[in-house]
């Protein structure tokens, strides 16, 4: 699922782009109104990132419009099972010109526990979140762990930590960390095999 970059977009909102101009905004909900800004290399297309935190029947969605590189646009989607029946999901949608069409979230797949688990955590303002057992479902046989920082004037510097089950490990190293004028820093990216649950 070459999509680990997409998870990072939950917190780092990607870098700016090339000689074209794109809308730039962030908001809670399905859309946002912002301002147009010129992109700088190597970003060459306009895009939207849709992010969702789902827990049982409750979900919170955000939208982020920005300039993107075409490589990020190919990442598509990611679903991270962080445990306690909760998921972090991301969708990337790019276009040659505004407005970009929305890429909707399908319903979460109904799948059974598969006998594996991963450390689960979702932490903001900390890189050492309390871990709990995230029971993996369906094809989720890998564990991810991401720690990073985003530097903001308001509400201040944000440290984040994300752990959970995913279906596969994409190729990503710290050297690929996305930056936005040095405001984003990816400190840790780990992806390992999930742990088999002990038999009763």
From Swiss-Prot:
The keyword Disulfide bond applies. Belongs to the CNF-like-inhibitor family. The keyword Disulfide bond applies. Inhibits the enzymatic activity of phospholipase A2 (PA2). This is Phospholipase A2 inhibitor LNF2. GO terms for molecular function: phospholipase A2 inhibitor activity. It is found in: Secreted. SUPFAM superfamilies: Snake toxin-like. Expressed by the liver. Residues 1-19 form the signal peptide. It comes from Lachesis muta muta (Bushmaster). One of its GO terms (cellular component) is extracellular region. Occurs as a mixture of oligomers. Tetrameric arrangement appears to be the predominant quaternary structure. The lineage of its organism: Eukaryota, Metazoa, Chordata, Craniata, Vertebrata. Glycans are attached at residue 176. Disulfide bonds join 22-46, 25-32, 39-67, 73-94, 95-100, 118-143, 136-165, 169-191. Keywords: Disulfide bond, Glycoprotein, Phospholipase A2 inhibitor, Secreted, Signal. InterPro entries: CNF-like_PLA2_Inhibitor, LY6_UPA_recep-like, PLipase_A2-inh_b-type, PLipase_A2_inh_N, Snake_toxin-like_sf. Transmembrane segments: none annotated. Pfam families: PLA2_inh.
